[in-house]
Curated annotation (Swiss-Prot):
The modification N6-acetyllysine is found at residue 6. It comes from Mus musculus (Mouse). It comes from the Eukaryota. GO terms for molecular function: single-stranded DNA binding. SMART domains: LisH (SM00667). The modification Phosphoserine is found at residue 321. This is Single-stranded DNA-binding protein 2. Residues 204-219, 289-299 have a biased composition (Gly residues).
Length: 361
């Protein structure tokens, strides 16, 4: 506990200093109690050669012992059988009341488990692959700013931005606001092109949270070599900017397959992975699958790049069912209906398509 070899320091006494002090106090005690012969014998036997300066009677050793004995007798287990002072008893009582708990004494609140009740799904950063029940969010692509749509939900749930959480009444845990992951490009321009009609306001039933895909004003992803590249908006998770205009005829693919792209190596990410996920092409499971809101977000590719989406046109959105939300592929585009999450925004594996508003790929 103490440093050794520092005999010149009074703050940190060495073992030799402690022994000298104790011998001095013993000699002093013997003299004060009248045992002078014993005191001289004691000094000669320990071969004391230094000068001794005695303190006032009764001496330090005697005073120290009296204080120790009083406190020793006032301990709770001995105070009934030993005499002690009221000061010693009060000292023990105060020390016992102020002593911290041996288990939780030094643990500040907030360390370990959170204070208060833990909400359901607190330890679930992502939703489970299948979520039975619960509302299914409609797909909203309004021609207005994100702030003007009340009750809009982020396109992708949970786990990416811990600085902000948005709870959902029917989800298992907090839905967290996030920035779009790699593989996501924005949807929906600020003004629709000549052949692109503004889509319906909602695809689901009443009371369902909408996924806003309004125009965004974030930082554009730099791609000076391609005029058709899509700005990558990072201002808000639901704030997506789409291709600048587009005057193609109806039926023009808004998202061409990788074979139709002419700049697949540019610094832009494709909206979806047209090729079904394989062992070397990781899925990005973001939604509940065939029973929940966003099971079709699993096919987003996080590695391949494609900056051209062509002169997009929205054909129609299926209105057969509030839960029928899908994108159909053009002939010749690879498609995997058997694997959930293979197609973007196809959470329910619908086989019925209506001519009203199905987005083409």
């Amino acid at each position: 506990m103490y440093g050794k070899g520092k005999s010149n320091s009074s703050a940190v006494p060495s073992d030799s200093q402690a022994r000298e002090k104790l011998a001095l106090y013993v000699y002093e005690y013997l003299l004060h109690v009248g045992a002078q012969k014993s005191a001289q014998t004691f000094l000669s036997e320990i071969r004391w050669e230094k000068n001794i300066t005695l303190g006032e009677p009764p001496g330090f050793l005697h005073s120290w012992w009296c204080v120790f004995w009083d406190l020793y007798c006032a301990a709770p287990e001995r105070r009934e059988t030993c005499e002690h002072s009221s000061e010693a008893k009060a000292f023990h009582d105060y020390s016992a009341a102020a002593a911290p708990s041996p288990v939780l004494g030094n643990m500040p609140p907030g360390d370990g488990m959170p204070v208060g009740p833990v909400p359901p799904g607190f330890f679930q950063p992502f939703m489970s692959p299948r979520y039975p029940g619960g509302p299914r969010p409609p797909l909203r692509i309004p021609n207005q700013a994100l702030g003007g749509v009340p009750g809009s939900q982020p396109l992708l749930p949970s786990g990416m931005d811990p600085t902000r959480q948005q709870g959902h009444p029917n989800m298992g845990g907090p839905m967290q606001r996030m920035t779009p992951p790699r593989g996501m490009v924005p949807l929906g321009p600020q003004n629709y092109g000549g052949a692109m009609r503004p889509p319906l306001n909602a695809l689901g039933g009443p009371g369902m949270p909408g996924m806003n895909m309004g125009p965004g004003g974030g930082r554009p992803w730099p791609n000076p070599t391609n005029a058709n590249s899509i700005p990558y908006s990072s201002a808000s998770p639901g704030n997506y900017v789409g291709p600048p205009g587009g005057g193609g005829p109806p039926g023009t693919p808004i998202m061409p397959s990788p074979a139709d792209s002419t700049n697949s190596g540019d610094n832009m990410y494709t909206l979806m992975n047209a090729v079904p996920p394989g062992p070397n092409r990781p899925n990005f499971p973001m939604g509940p699958g065939s029973d929940g809101p966003m099971g079709g977000l699993g096919g987003m590719e996080s590695h391949h790049m494609n900056g051209s989406l062509g002169s997009g046109d929205m054909d129609s959105i299926s209105k057969n069912s509030p839960n029928n939300m899908s994108l159909s592929n053009q002939p010749g585009t690879p498609r995997d209906d058997g694997e959930m999450g293979g197609n973007f925004l196809n959470p329910f594996q619908s086989e019925s398509y209506s001519p009203s508003m199905t987005m083409s790929v």
